[in-house]
Amino acid sequence: MNIFEELKARGLVFQTTDEQALVKALTEGQVSYYTGYDPTADSLHLGHLVAILTSRRLQLAGHKPYALVGGATGLIGDPSFKDAERSLQTKETVLEWSDKIKGQLSTFLDFENGDNKAELVNNYDWFSQISFIDFLRDVGKYFTVNYMMSKDSVKKRIETGISYTEFAYQIMQGYDFYELNDKHNVTLQIGGSDQWGNMTAGTELLRKKADKTGHVMTVPLITDSTGKKFGKSEGNAVWLDADKTSPYEMYQFWLNVMDDDAVRFLKIFTFLFLDEIAEIETQFNAARHERLAQKTLAREVVTLVHGEEAYKQALNITEQLFAGNIKNLSANELKQGLSNVPNYHVQSEDSLNLVDMLVTAGISPSKRQAREDVQNGAIYINGDRVQDLDYQLSNDDKIDDQLTVIRRGKKKYAVLTY
């Protein structure tokens, strides 16, 4: 199985400009290719991971990746299938975000070894050297307005309005391809399927300006089995930055993937061999309640993104919380595992009587209910049941001198911080 056949088998090929020619190029020698990442935030997220891992698969097959950080295009904003104009960021912010994204990409691509080691480029380096007049003369003249208006990504915005700034974005992305081809002999661009219009602007410019053929391959935008856009948890992006989405939260995200998606995602997001995945699928279908596919997915992706120690910690947090063993976890581990539960910062004037604190922290709705909860054995401090109405919270209840975990019943948690 050649690399293109493997990508297809994993569900990673959505569209290509000329499949036969691309397969020929990939099987006959080393291909230099690029994927672009606009710094629209200070971290990449799971939505980017499909293209990143596809790039890594091609590198493992001997081809040479260029990771383009859009320091210039990030200042403009990509209109592709967006309902409204993006807010423009300052140059300083985009530069800072660009540096962070560069660091994240080095986790996945090999920038150090072999003749196909990855290269980092930033399109601000060339766009900052081009005057507006030169850009119109040397690039703009190759694009008709009719051609630009025909792009689906632009059509969607015509009714609501699109600025010239965003309208020109596709020409800038097209010029990226031309520049990388001219300087580095890059002949293939990889990106999400929503980028097709912008990406083919590059092949058009290559053909008209340099009389060369470039290839485009898009990866699918991943949705779950209900059609919902993938990569968000409770409406929020799942970030690759551990400070924005902890390894535990990422672990839980994968653990909760629906059965109908789990095996497909193993093909897309892991480097397990396809025959290994087929074996996992057989075991998974025989006992879905054991969630083997989801557990494997969580292990592989968290290890890939954050390392084996982070995976082991996420697994330990999961197991200890499930068992109610609060005291077996550090304060930092509890902050990860209980990041979504109510948090109350204890004030110096607060009563430390347990009944009072249950009401103050919003755990019980009233003192009467709080007393009943304590007497009925429904209240736990750091996993231990407390039934003393006169119980006073003390330093002994602080884990690592930072927090106390209170549970009401089986599932209602609250964290007291000091």
Swiss-Prot record:
Signal peptide: none annotated. This is Tyrosine--tRNA ligase. It is an enzyme of class 6 (ligase). The gene is tyrS. L-tyrosine binds at residues 34, 169, 173. A motif ('HIGH' region) lies at residues 39-48. It comes from Streptococcus pyogenes serotype M28 (strain MGAS6180). Homodimer. GO terms for molecular function: ATP binding; RNA binding; tyrosine-tRNA ligase activity. Belongs to the class-I aminoacyl-tRNA synthetase family. TyrS type 1 subfamily. It is found in: Cytoplasm.
